[in-house]
Design a protein with these regions (language model features):
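Portal/gating segments that form or line small-molecule/metal binding sites
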Residues: 1-145, 155-205
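Acidic-residue sensor for enzyme active/binding pockets
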Residues: 148
Length: 205
């Protein structure tokens, strides 16, 4: 049985839109793309690589897939371990209609997302890892399919842009299983989804 894990770059105010470049995702007139780049470091790159190398297969939304497919197949240096990992991995692509998938080892999950992902989780071992893919992740979270979240939080408030969790996301508590403080104020946190949140009161009897 696989676990479904999610990895995201995220701002202090929860924005995940266009972390890697100004033209990555301009939906809604978003003009702050590339906000991760000034804070990136060798230590962060190593931590991201360790996380992605845990994946047995990848699950990507169509937009993230297209961004990756425009770049990684062009990186052919065998010494680039991230390119080797991403190019060699099976990539399951979520899209409402069947897309043309030219990147090697890419497969459409089909029209029934929930059934397809449940089947993928049941058929193997290790991690089925969703990278970025905010719209897809929101759907998976609403379906109760996400087992873990790995978040790299950057010390920036963007004030606008698409946020990781929808306003109607189901309430969930999280168990912290891994934590590290990295260079330039970036934090690494890995959470396990732990069920419904509990509540209490500070009121005195």
């Amino acid at each position: 049985m696989r676990t479904l894990t999610v990895t995201q770059f995220i701002s202090l105010d929860g924005v995940v839109q266009a972390p890697g470049g100004p033209d990555e995702d301009t939906r809604g007139g978003f003009e702050l793309g590339g906000w991760v780049v000034p804070h990136f470091s060798e230590a962060l790159g190593a931590r991201v690589g360790e996380t992605h190398f845990r994946a047995s297969e990848l699950l990507l939304g169509r937009r993230t897939y297209d961004i990756f497919a425009a770049h990684w197949p062009r990186v052919t240096d065998p010494a680039d371990t991230m390119a080797t990992k991403l190019n060699g991995s099976v990539k399951h692509v979520a899209s409402h209609t069947e897309p043309a998938l030219a990147w090697a080892h890419s497969r459409w999950v089909g029209a029934d997302l929930e059934s397809a992902v449940r089947a993928l989780l049941a058929e193997g071992e290790g991690e089925l890892q969703a990278i970025g893919s905010r719209d897809l992740v929101q759907s998976l979270f609403a379906l109760g399919l996400v087992d873990e979240l790995t978040l790299w939080t950057f010390p920036v408030v963007l004030g606008k842009g698409n946020r990781l969790f929808a306003a109607d996301a189901p309430p969930r508590s999280m168990e912290l299983v891994e934590s590290a403080d990295l260079d330039h104020g970036v934090t690494h946190r890995r959470y396990r989804v732990a069920g419904a949140p509990t509540a209490g009161s500070f009121a005195l009897d």
